[in-house]
Each structure stands twice: as structure tokens, then as C-alpha cells.
Amino acid sequence: MKKLLIILMVLTAAGFTGCPHTINTTKESKLTDKTYSIDGINFVMKAIHSVRDGMLGADNQSDNKKHTVSLSAYRIGETEVTQELWKKVMKANPSYFSDKPFKGEIQRKRPVDKVSWYECIAFCNELTKKTDGLGEANCVYYSDPAFKKIYTKEDAKSTARVFQNMDKKGFRLPTEAEWEWAAKGGAKTKWAGTDKPSDLKNYAWYTKNSKNITHEVRKKEPNGYGLYDMSGNVEEWVWDGYNEKLPESGEQDPIGDLYSQTRAVRGGHITKESEECECAHRHDSAPGTKGYLRGFRLACRP
């Protein structure tokens, strides 16, 4: 009896440690991946369950030390947004890498690049409008704080201020915390999919294997959540205003610095060294810039 009591005490204590807890409500138990189609172009959004006290950051990152966050359930793009999807929605392909794909790869399935943060915002709304089951009523981004005026392509051209309504279920940019949690893939690995430098070539296109060009998505191994290219190919815009100091541990669904003049960028790219491809690595860029090594991936509420 005494031995049983000790075991029960140990198990009870274990339930109150700092380990992350996936919150599986009845509703979330039905949360699954979802495939969308826009005029024959399919893309997959992977389901990520909510988490309490999930560990992000790393000790070797000066602007992203270890800290915990709690996140509501969400979906995130299996891949970076491709050139074919961007062109279908926006009627043009702005990419620097718009021709001469690597041998055997399909040009239209390379990630879109050379897009500003504002243009990504407009794209998310345009895609939401075109998606069956969503439509304009589910657009996330607005040009006014009362959420009356849908953010448009014209707003993006004028770099108008963006207001985000996270209660909407349309497509959007992931937050930094959502992006990093997804990149880790349910593990504690340094890169998306692996903790071994020698294995990084199997998961990411970066300086040692890219030949300085972007590549068709889904050509490398996925991470634990079934996501591709989160440590390489193109780096990715996220929603958050950048601040060198992240919020204290314990925040629920953090969205970044509302007054920052720059936006956070995540993930490695084809000319980055391995250190800059780590899941916890972060930097920033002015939202109006159009880097030829920068794209994005989608997120949405389930």
C-alpha cells in the first residue's frame, strides 16, 4: 500500500511540471488536416492542437531565449506558398526565381518570393475571398480598427496600416510563436526535423546544398508535424512586429510588438549557414521590402 501511494504521488507531481501540455478538448479531438482547392490548385493546411506552456527559444539566441507560450489550436501551411497559387490569386508572379528550375523540378511549385509583408496580407484576404466555405466575411485583415474595411491589394500598394481580427477563420500569416512551435514539430530539435547538423541536408535547402536557387516545395523530408522547408528554401514573413525582447513566459497567443516599424522573419534560406536556419533564429525587415529570398506560409483558425 505504501509503495502504491508513493507511485501515485510521483505521477501526480509529474502532472504539474513545466512540460508542455497539449489540450485535447472534445472539439480538438476532431481537428484534422484540411485540403483546399482554388481552380484546381490544391494546398494543405496541417492541424496543430492547442498547447499550454510550450517551450520556445534557445539559449544560443540573444533575442529569443527560452520561454514558454500557450497557443490556441490552429492550422498552418504544409508548404510555403507556391508561385502557382500566388499567380492564381493575384494574377501575376513577382518571383525573382521565375524560371530555370533545378533539373527535374517543377517551376510553378517553387515558393513565391520577392513579396512584401503588405502584399502577403492582401494575398491572404484575396485567397479567403476565393475559398469555398470562407469568403469575404471571414477575412482576417482590415484597414480600420473597427474591422469594417477589408484590406485590399490597393491598400498594400500604399502600405496602409493593417488591423488583424484573430476571431476570423480566413487565411493569415502565422504569428512568430505559432511559426516556431510548428517548426519544432513536436520535438526539441534545433532545426525543423533534426537535431544533427549532418542530417540538415535531408530537411532543408541552405547554403551547402541549394546551388543558390530556390527549389520545388516538398522535395526534402518533413518535420514531425508534416511540414516542409521550415529551415530553408525561402525565409518567411510572419505577422509580428519585431522586438529584440520577447514577452515574458506564460503569454497566451502573443502577437508581437504593436508599435514596431519592422516585421519578424523566420526560417533559413538558400544562402544561409546552418546556424541561421535554426527554429529559434529570428530577425526582422521593413514590411515594404521585397527580398528575393523571402516568401511566407499560411495559417488560419480551425
Region locations from a protein language model:
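Sec-dependent N-terminal signal peptides
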Residues: 4-12
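C-terminal motif of bacterial Sec signal peptides marking the signal peptidase cleavage site
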Residues: 17-18
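GGW-centered surface loops in extracellular recognition modules
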Residues: 25-47, 162, 168-171
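Short acidic-hydrophobic surface loop/beta-edge motif
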Residues: 32-39, 46, 52-60, 67-69
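Conserved beta-strand positions that form and line the central face of beta-propeller blades
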Residues: 47, 96, 111, 190, ...
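Active-site microenvironments of metalloenzymes and redox enzymes
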Residues: 55-57, 70-196, 202, 240-244, ...
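Surface-exposed recognition segments
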Residues: 63-67, 187-188, 210-213, 230-302
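Short, well-ordered junction/capping motifs at the entry into regular secondary structure
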Residues: 157-168, 201-231, 283-286
